[in-house]
Amino acid sequence: MSEKFLYALARPFLFAIDPEAAHNLTLHALRRAASLGWTSAIAKPAHDPRTVMGITFPNPVGLAAGLDKDGAYIDGLATLGFGFIEVGTVTPHAQPGNPLPRMFRLPQANAIINRMGFNNGGVDAFVSNVQASRFYQNKEGILGLNIGKNADTPIERAVDDYLICLEKVYPYASYVTVNISSPNTKNLRQLQGASELDALLAQLKEAQQRLADQHQRYVPIALKIAPDIDTEQIQTIAQALLRHKMDGVIATNTTINREAVKNMKHAEEAGGLSGAPVFASSNAVIRALKAELGDALPIIGVGGILSGTDAQAKIAAGASLVQLYTGLIYRGPALIRECAAALRAPT
């Protein structure tokens, strides 16, 4: 029985209940199925290796951060055929995130609005979950760990939170993502400004070099940016990434723009909009970044991928790898295999 058929059966039920409840139910079911060995034959990662940031990825289709914020479901997610998995965003201390409800479906737009607010159990619990996963213990694949700042940390001290998290997740990560682009943590996107970004990247790079010496292993750091930036901001970010010799950039996070979903139910809800409406703006940022960075720094493309053709468009815009999230909600895990097939390198 194919994952496409199974998801077609499950989707009407999942879409009939609260989006966050459906999210949690799906993850629990996947973890349970994996623990019982029921998922072992669902999907092996397609073999289409790509070397990016010095890492060889089994294939170029990954899971974006946000689905598994606490790293509690890694083994279940690893059965779906991803070339890499990114978990988080995690913060130094546990926090509940924003009040419920905080996730909304816009099915006519193949979109989601969320204002989760980095809800997570804190970095110590996160690291324990990663360590406990078979995926980590058996070195089964590529694991990205995504870090952020606590909501009650003043923006002027944000770098402290990133450094705390980097120190703790570094030994367990294939790569680390620095999330400065969620619209759901007050003032977070200020860190994309020239002086703020310079200060942040300088200290992250210094810590990375120290940790590489300490652990005898270099772990790449990628920066995750927003789609709601203009050409000048893109140039500023690109120059800072090059100046500080960062390892990669993930483009993009969710958008605060509502033009594409105007007058739809839930369109006025606060939060970040993901899915099909962010596809074009994300691609525009990727193209502009590619023009600035050339081949000096790889781009991981995320935002609005709902088909293999969409994944191809991200690569054509300048990305080296792609990530999925909202597309999985609307298309199910068959989307992973479809994207991997569409991106398969010619033999």
From Swiss-Prot:
Which cofactors does it use?
A: FMN
Active site: residue positions: S182
Q: Which CDD domains match?
A: DHOD_2_like
The question of whether Ligase is a record keyword is answered with no
- GO process annotations (BP): 'de novo' pyrimidine nucleobase biosynthetic process; 'de novo' UMP biosynthetic process
A molecular function (GO) held by this record is: dihydroorotate dehydrogenase (quinone) activity
Q: Which reaction does it catalyse?
A: (S)-dihydroorotate + a quinone = orotate + a quinol
Can you tell me which residues bind FMN?
Answer: A65, G66, L67, D68, K69, T89, N146, N179, K224, T252, G275, G304, Y325, T326
Q: Which InterPro entries match?
A: Aldolase_TIM, DHO_dehydrogenase, Dihydroorotate_DH_1_2, Dihydroorotate_DH_2, Dihydroorotate_DH_cat, Dihydroorotate_DH_CS
Cofactor: bound how, per the entry note? Answer: Binds 1 FMN per subunit.
Pfam families noted in UniProt: DHO_dh
Quote the cellular component terms of the Gene Ontology held in the record: cytoplasm; plasma membrane
Its predominant location is: membrane
Flavoprotein as UniProt keyword? yes
Swiss-Prot/TrEMBL keywords: Cell membrane, Flavoprotein, FMN, Membrane, Oxidoreductase, Pyrimidine biosynthesis
- UniProt: substrate binding residues: K69, N114, R115, M116, G117, F118, N179, N184, N253, T254
Q: In which pathway does it act?
A: Pyrimidine metabolism; UMP biosynthesis via de novo pathway; orotate from (S)-dihydroorotate (quinone route): step 1/1
Compartments reported by the entry: Cell membrane
According to its UniProt record, the EC number is: 1.3.5.2
Q: Which HAMAP family match?
A: DHO_dh_type2
State the similarity comment.
Belongs to the dihydroorotate dehydrogenase family. Type 2 subfamily.
* Oligomeric form and interacting partners: Monomer.
Any idea what job this protein has?
Answer: Catalyzes the conversion of dihydroorotate to orotate with quinone as electron acceptor.
User: What protein name is recorded for this chain?
Assistant: Dihydroorotate dehydrogenase (quinone)
